A protein has these predicted regions:
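General "foldedness" signal
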Residues: 50, 72-74, 86, 104-106, ...
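Short amphipathic alpha-helical surface micro-motifs
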Residues: 16-20, 26, 53-57, 86-88, ...
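Sparse, context-dependent recognition of short Cys/His-centered cofactor- or disulfide-binding micro-motifs
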Residues: 19-23, 28, 57-59, 75, ...
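Gram-positive cell-envelope targeting signals
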Residues: 1-37
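Flexible, low-complexity linkers/stalks enriched in Thr/Pro that connect modular domains
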Residues: 28-30, 106-111, 183-187, 267-269
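Serine/threonine-rich, repeat-prone extracellular segments and beta-strand-based repeat modules
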Residues: 1-12, 65-104, 141-184, 221-269
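Solvent-exposed, low-complexity, repeat-rich "mucin-like" stalks and linkers
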Residues: 27-65, 112-145, 189-224
């Protein structure tokens, strides 16, 4: 009888101990954080790289959860350093919401500073900041459209002209500056010359096709194709070998019964 009681007590203790051990190992917290691994300390990508491109060569794993590579997120990307490199930081979370972050260098294969865009003629019968703000934007080879980053400072209006000083920067921290002249002309033109671009960037030594830049000639809401051959381009002192800004004027010749005028700017870099 006594042996049975001892055996029963022993089995009870074993069961209790086993239960406690089971609960401990089943319910214990995962105190280990995930690990992020890179196949190289620097990634080189094109300027308009996607998130998928930026995640190439990055893996993550966790002792409890296994492979977490598909859960990696891009946490932040710094501005350029002095060598035009950025620091890209990644983060990953395990199922217990423990996180790990790691960083590596980012280098672009081809990067160009932000460029401004102008969507309408720089010669207008309306001289308002609302009109100017809607016309001027900017693009970044990294960020795409950065119209919201453009800052415009106006100078003193004189002789029907207003200087515009433009500044813009993208996420790399690179700033671009440009000075334009916005002209006021209250002439009642009977038609409109529409251009493909009103701000044309070209490298020194190269030439822009100013004729091909003509999109259409409109009279009211109708396009007059025949008037395309009557557009006259005044290039002024345009010199493709000398960096600078050059005003280009498009108008209709005297052989038509219509009048029109618009202005574009060529930026020789």
């Amino acid at each position: 009888m006594k042996h049975k009681q001892v055996l029963s007590l022993f089995l009870t203790l074993v069961l209790i101990g086993g239960y406690i051990a089971f609960q401990y190992y089943y319910n214990k917290d995962d105190n280990t954080a995930p690990v992020i691994t890179f196949d190289s300390d620097m990634i080189k990508v094109k300027a308009d790289a996607s998130d998928e491109d930026l995640l190439e060569g990055v893996t993550a794993s966790d002792q409890e959860d296994g492979d977490l590579t598909d859960d990696i997120l891009i946490d932040s990307i710094s501005a350029f350093n002095s060598e035009e490199e950025r620091t890209i930081t990644y983060v990953v979370f395990d199922k217990d919401n423990k996180s790990t972050s790691a960083s590596r260098k980012l280098k672009y294969k081809k990067y160009t500073a932000p460029k401004f865009t102008v969507s309408d003629s720089l010669l207008q019968s309306s001289l308002t900041m609302t009109k100017i703000n809607t016309m001027i934007g900017a693009t970044s080879s990294v960020d795409g459209n950065i119209d919201g980053n453009v800052e415009i400072k106006t100078g003193t209006y004189e002789d029907h002209k207003m200087p515009l000083d433009l500044t813009v920067s993208d996420s790399t921290g690179t700033e671009s500056h440009l000075s334009l002249i916005y002209e006021y002309d209250n002439t009642s033109y009977t038609s409109d010359i529409v251009l493909k671009k009103y701000l044309i960037y070209v490298k020194a030594g190269k030439e822009a096709d100013l004729e091909d830049n003509i999109d259409s000639v409109m009279v009211g809401n109708s396009e007059y194709v025949d008037l395309m051959d009557h557009v006259v381009i005044k290039r002024g002192d345009l010199d493709y070998d000398v960096p600078g800004l050059y005003d280009i004027y498009y108008s209709l010749d005297d052989e038509t019964n219509f009048t029109a005028k618009c202005k574009a700017v060529v930026v020789v870099q």
